[in-house]
């Protein structure tokens, strides 16, 4: 009496023979830019249109001391400040 079980054959992955051989490439590598490049110019400090050219504001002049640096950009929205890296 034969008590041996038949051995299962282990096959490796099927290889295509005779086809073009191409080396396998990894995922594409992206280089990060070191400097930011903006399509438009960054905003200038100061309130636009403020000074002696506004009727009723002649006595104030244009010499305004900025106490907080955010006051220099108070004419801009937060998303504009973030776009140019100010905040």
UniProtKB/Swiss-Prot annotation:
Pfam families: PDE6_gamma (PF04868)
Cross-referenced InterPro entries: PDE6_gamma, PDE6_gamma_sf
Domain of life assignment: Eukaryota
N-acetylmethionine modified-residue sites: 1
Keywords: Acetylation, cGMP, Hydrolase, Sensory transduction, Vision
EC code(s) of this entry: 3.1.4.35
Annotated segments matching region Disordered: 16-54
Family under the similarity heading: Belongs to the rod/cone cGMP-PDE gamma subunit family.
Described function: Participates in processes of transmission and amplification of the visual signal. cGMP-PDEs are the effector molecules in G-protein-mediated phototransduction in vertebrate rods and cones.
Protein name stated in the entry: Retinal rod rhodopsin-sensitive cGMP 3',5'-cyclic phosphodiesterase subunit gamma
UniProt gene name: PDE6G
């Amino acid at each position: 009496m034969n008590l041996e079980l038949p051995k299962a054959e282990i096959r490796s992955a099927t290889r295509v023979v005779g086809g073009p051989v191409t080396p396998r490439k990894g995922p594409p590598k992206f280089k990060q830019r070191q400097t930011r490049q903006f399509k438009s110019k960054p905003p200038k400090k100061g309130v636009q249109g403020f000074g002696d050219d506004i009727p009723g504001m002649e006595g104030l002049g244009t010499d305004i001391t900025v106490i907080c640096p955010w006051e220099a950009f108070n004419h801009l929205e937060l998303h504009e400040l973030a776009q140019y890296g100010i905040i």
